[in-house]
Amino acid sequence: MSEWPTSIQITEVGPRDGLQNQSKPISTEAKISLINALSKTGLTCIETSAFVHPTWVPQLSDADEVFAGINRNSNVLYTALVPNERGWNRALAAGADEIAVLSAASETFCQRNTNTSIDGAIERIRPIVEHAVTCEVGVRGYISCVIACPYEGDTNLQTVRYITQQMLDMGITDI
């Protein structure tokens, strides 16, 4: 039996993933307050927001303001989801400590979520990862639908392996 790790890192994604689909607007001040409170809990990584187009995800249209307004704790990494190069530039300007990029192991989900194919999503994140590596900014890779897709059902494990390998080859070590 292999040895268990001595520590793990939990990334709190509530300020981004938990708030992005809320039907009622959440004020920038409330988001900042939530992140500041989470920063005092002992968490070491908080996904603060996403630098996405406001038409697609209106709840996160204030990502720049949220990053500017939080009280940074030196023991916490404040990360952001970036779906494209424009998002990367905004995250870098806002001072995100790390970024997250994404793909999905389902063509249908990928089309509906990122408006491109699996291969298109991989090619879209490649230059972002290159920029991040050059700037020494950590990158986490997300793969949605690794078990099942709400549109296609069970996921093909070979697709998950393919995306994982592509991400590893780019230099992403946290998937």
Q: What is the predicted role of each segment?
A:
Residues 4-51, 59-63, 69-75:
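Conserved N-terminal beta1-alpha1 strand-loop-helix module at the mouth
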Residues 11-32, 76-85, 112-117, 145-158:
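Active-site mouth loops of central-metabolism enzymes
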Residues 11-13, 97-106, 140-144:
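Non-cysteine beta-strand/loop elements that form the S-adenosyl-L-methionine
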Residues 18, 38, 91, 99, ...:
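Conserved, mostly hydrophobic/aromatic
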Residues 44-69, 102-117, 147-152:
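Glycine-rich, proline-tolerant flexible connector loops at the mouths of alpha/beta enzymes
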Residues 56-80, 119-144, 162-166:
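Alpha-helix-loop-beta-strand connector modules within alpha/beta enzyme cores
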